[in-house]
Design a protein with these regions (language model features):
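Aromatic (phenylalanine/tyrosine) cluster motif
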Residues: 3-5, 19
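Short, charged low-complexity linear segments at domain edges
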Residues: 200-221, 230-246
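Iron-sulfur cluster-binding cysteine motifs and their immediate structural context
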Residues: 224-225, 230-257, 261-279
């Protein structure tokens, strides 16, 4: 079922078969908040959902933050009895292309999963479908899914301040619905296939275009550094791809995913982007997709 913020069915009646003879609710040992979150928006949504699930299911919560590259160098495996709220941002309508291989390498081990994608108020396109398919192939059992519109990583105005109190309240209610569904399951294997919006197989990445319809390529774009930089090394330490030279922040020595983590974390506000195509695309996004406000979508 698909629900939006305005759906009157706030709590689903999913427990009617819970006490049927021969069936007992499955045991959840640990709720996990697992996420890649360059600018902390996905982190906020996933943590809110996981914390509430932990409270409702009365089991411990652990965090698996794989934003930084050194974390992704170690294989990760979950197990039966885990309930993993698994969040990624949406880049170009998909799970980030520089991240999807790592996500595919994570072993579900029979754990339940709640795929969550956070996007910048344009569109999540096939991202949730892609994450669901990837987690399923990795041995997870997706039990529910959600999309949340958050502040765009490029912008200070597009989706500014989101997730806000309204979003996080919806996240809490969603967790309650997930809890009811989990409590009605006799086992993870009994979880029915999760239906979400998006194509299967997934479609191409979203391509930004100028007003004449010509494609804009921002893949080679890298951040610049102002003279106010003190070489504190914060940006190099925080870069999810370790693309910034720790000895000289002016040097970008690897691929950049335009996540803007370095821009947001620099204490001197010395990191910035000045590429004309990047700025054009940023302006187009702000002009076309700041409004109307898009609300969370919940899939159960």
């Amino acid at each position: 079922s698909i629900f939006t913020f305005s759906d009157p069915s706030a709590i689903l009646n999913l427990t009617k078969n819970k006490y049927r003879k021969g069936i007992s609710p499955m045991q959840i040992n640990t709720v996990w908040a697992a996420y890649f979150s360059a600018t902390d928006t996905t982190k906020k949504v996933v943590t809110q959902i996981a914390r509430r699930l932990s409270q409702q299911l009365q089991c411990p919560m652990q965090t698996f933050d794989f934003t930084l590259k050194h974390v992704r160098k170690t294989p990760k495996a979950f197990a039966a009895g885990d309930l993993v709220v698994f969040g990624t941002p949406v880049y170009a309508g998909r799970v980030p292309n520089l991240l999807i291989k790592y996500v595919a390498s994570i072993q579900g081990g029979g754990a339940l999963a709640v795929p969550v994608v956070c996007y910048g108020n344009r569109n999540y396109d096939d991202a949730l479908s892609e994450l669901r398919l990837t987690l399923t192939a990795g041995g997870f059992h997706p039990v529910a899914g959600a999309t949340f519109s958050c502040q765009h990583s490029f912008s200070l105005t597009q989706g500014a301040g989101r997730p806000d109190i309204s979003d996080l309240t919806i996240a809490t209610g969603f967790a309650d619905q997930v809890c009811h569904k989990v409590e009605a399951l006799p086992s993870a294997e009994a979880c029915p296939p999760l239906l979400v919006k998006g194509n299967d197989p997934v479609g191409p990445y979203y391509t930004p275009r100028d007003r004449h319809g010509n494609p804009i390529n921002i893949l080679p774009v890298k951040p610049k550094t102002k003279d106010t930089c003190t070489q504190c090394g914060r940006c190099a330490k925080e870069c999810p791809l370790e693309a910034i030279d720790p000895a000289d922040a002016h040097n970008i020595v690897g691929k950049c995913m335009k996540c803007n983590r370095c821009v947001r974390h620099c204490p001197r506000h010395a990191k910035y982007f000045d590429d004309p195509n990047y700025l054009y695309h940023k302006t187009e996004l702000e002009e076309q997709y700041t409004w109307p406000r898009k609300e969370p979508e919940l899939f159960l």
